[in-house]
């Protein structure tokens, strides 16, 4: 099991570090664009990166981190267990076992339409519990949801379920993850 305080601190520092890193990369890219514009104003030059591009870069890196953690934790947790027979059992494993290891609680609600769509709901998502005002930390919420989405993507991919995950936290700390299976 992952130490709760260690995980909280790790998530805060990872989000801050990735935001800082993305801002630095965007500044470097914008400096190159400015240099190209000064040297040859008539040539085709890519547009400058905006603040939303920075946020997307940071969220993408956070999701990648979550994918790595989810895939490797799933492999460790399933090392001595029999193979899970069907998709529903694999998703239940992620909701119960993996979520418990990372956030010390299970997913509160799992729904499916039995046609390749699962909705996982967490009524008290630990990574968002400390937020007082929903709008005050939009970037933080986005980063935490990116990590959790990546965690789900990595775990399900390691279980042989290619999918896409869309996270929604309209009223933090309540959040839901819409998992859509890819057709094989």
For each predicted feature, which ranges?
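Structural signal for hydrophobic/aromatic residues that build the beta-strand cores
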Residues: 152, 165, 177-179
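Short beta-strand
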Residues: 109-110, 165-170
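Mixed-charge, glycine-accented linear interaction segment located at domain edges/termini
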Residues: 148-162
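N-terminal accessory segment detector
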Residues: 1-142, 183
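C-terminal helix/juxtamembrane-tail motif
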Residues: 172-184
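Eukaryote-biased feature marking scaffold/signaling PDZ-domain proteins and nuclear chromatin regulators
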Residues: 113-115, 147, 160, 172-174
